[in-house]
A protein has these predicted regions:
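A short beta-strand motif characteristic of beta-propeller blades
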Residues: 1, 33-35, 39-46, 82-88, ...
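A generic, well-ordered mixed alpha/beta core segment in the N-terminal half of proteins
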Residues: 1-36
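Beta-rich, blade/repeat-based domains predominating
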Residues: 3-17, 41-60, 89-104, 135-153, ...
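Conserved beta-strand positions in repeat-built beta-propeller and related beta-rich domains
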Residues: 19-24, 66-69, 109-113, 158-161, ...
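Structural signal for beta-propeller blades
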Residues: 25-28, 72-74, 115-117, 164-166, ...
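Short loop/turn segments immediately following beta-strands, especially the blade-tip
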Residues: 32-34, 79-80, 120-127, 169-175, ...
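Loop-centered beta-sheet repeat module
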Residues: 61-115
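Blade-level signature of beta-propeller repeat domains, shared across WD40, Kelch, NHL, RCC1
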Residues: 203-209, 219-234
Length: 234
């Protein structure tokens, strides 16, 4: 058991296994080391308490990172989930998931509540915030929630639930340039990339859609899957 409510993300680091519990604002190092966050953010509906959403190791394996959507923070912890230091996104943004650059020098955080990406520079012992970039087109005025974030071949991809798209950014160290949008099915909660193919989980229309990176991001197949939430590869 994860010793919390609504477990939503899991990771391994060597032989250690970690998970986070969204509704109880906690992280666990299995089997029984629990870290419970305290506090709240400025959004009364979504940040009334801590909401841990992602756990993952930095590429150098020095820290276990835990994002807290309710506190607008990223916690950098030791292997026993003791907090070493934190990094913050702007208030009310809602830090959701992280992606790490191939060289390990940059961390990219998708902010669920404002549909943006905040870039941090990481030197192995601290992080510095750089810039925040919108993942939506300027003309979009509807409701949207940022969701998944991935890096593949010097591009960064972020899914939008509402605009129903995957935003494509070109990466230049700590700079991002929004270059394209892939239009998806309804509510693309998660996606992943392998062999130049994007596999996108469209939760509300029961499909997984496949796109070819080498063929101008063209839709090449649609698979029926009931309420898909996550896609991963062995």
């Amino acid at each position: 058991p994860t010793k919390g409510k609504v477990a939503c993300h899991i990771c391994t680091c060597d032989d250690d296994v970690y998970a986070v519990n969204y509704s109880s604002g906690s992280a666990i190092h299995f089997p029984d080391t629990l870290a419970v966050h305290e506090g709240k953010g400025i959004n009364p509906k979504r940040q009334e308490m801590p909401h841990t959403h992602f756990v993952g190791a930095t590429p150098d394996k020095k820290y276990i990172c835990v994002t807290d959507l309710g506190l607008d923070k990223i916690f950098f912890c030791d292997r026993n989930l003791n907090t070493c230091f934190t990094a913050a996104v702007p208030q009310g943004y809602g830090a959701r998931h992280l992606a790490f650059s191939d060289d390990g020098q940059y961390i990219y955080c998708v902010n669920e509540l404002v549909s943006s990406v905040t870039v941090f520079e990481y030197d192995g012992k601290s992080v510095k915030p750089r810039e925040t970039y919108s993942a939506l087109p300027n003309e979009f005025c509807g409701t949207n929630l940022g969701a998944a974030i991935r890096i593949y071949k010097n591009r960064l991809y972020v899914s939008n639930r509402g605009h129903n798209s995957i935003a494509v950014f070109d990466i230049n160290d700590d700079k991002l340039e929004l270059s394209d949008f892939i239009m998806t099915g309804d509510h693309p909660r998660d996606f992943n990339i392998a062999d130049d193919m994007i596999f996108c989980c469209n939760m509300n229309d029961d499909t997984v859609t496949l796109y070819s990176i080498n063929d101008s991001l063209r839709l090449i197949d649609t698979i029926s899957v009931k309420a898909p939430l996550c896609v991963n590869f062995e």
